A protein has these predicted regions:
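Residues at alpha-helix caps and immediate loop-helix transition turns in enzyme cores, especially N-
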Residues: 107, 139, 164-165
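Internal catalytic-core helix/loop-beta-alpha segment
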Residues: 58-130
Length: 197
């Protein structure tokens, strides 16, 4: 993410203030953040495609301070990992992954089932992070395919190649995703919620 990182996304640092604002909403208890994080081993197969990055236990695998919260639950990419029944005590759930796709972690489905039990039917995932044409795309597409509403926070995502990022945004909006700003995402948290039976 950051300059000097092994898999730096140029321009991503300009998104950090908006990523922090979105994360602050979780710190204030207004929203639960469901995120993913690469947690690779030194000999990970993904390194045949990308340079080694986010190796578990190294500074490069740490979440940047602006998007780090206190009450976080990290769920490893293992079928035997336990997903607590009650996630209400957390500000952020991190699904660890070793590929681009968060849905390769078998526990992603369990977290979504939990979220579905406790959210309104009109709940929407606001997606932010890097890189638009890789991890952001796969997370958004996976959610849309599972019937979730998705908004891409356009001023809190960044792409490796602008033309690929634009194609990705066009693809995702054609599948039903909305494009919103950080201000719009935060304003949506202020609207009163009504639950329908």
């Amino acid at each position: 993410m950051l300059p000097g990182g092994k898999l730096h996304v140029p321009g991503a640092e300009k998104c950090i203030p908006n990523m922090k604002r979105l994360t602050d909403a979780a710190r204030e208890g207004r929203v639960l953040i469901i995120g993913d994080a690469c947690t690779h081993t030194p000999d990970d197969p993904e390194f045949q495609r990308f340079p080694p990055h986010c190796i578990r236990g190294t500074p490069g695998a740490e979440i940047i301070p602006e998007t780090r919260v206190v009450k976080v639950l990290s769920i490893p990419n293992r079928p035997d990992a336990v997903v607590p029944q009650d996630l209400s005590g957390y500000q952020q759930i991190i699904l660890e992954k070793q590929t681009l796709d968060v849905f390769d972690n078998p526990n992603t489905e369990a977290v979504l089932k939990h979220i579905a039990r406790f959210t309104d039917a009109d709940a929407e995932f606001c997606i932010f992070g890097v890189a638009t044409e890789y991890c952001v795309r796969l997370a958004a597409k996976g959610l849309l395919e599972r019937g979730w509403r998705v908004a891409l926070v356009r001023d809190a995502i960044e792409t490796l190649k602008p033309e690929d990022g634009q194609k990705t945004i066009e693809e995702l909006t054609s599948l039903g995703a909305r494009l919103i700003s950080t201000d719009q995402a935060l304003a949506a948290l202020e609207r009163p919620k009504t639950r329908t039976a």
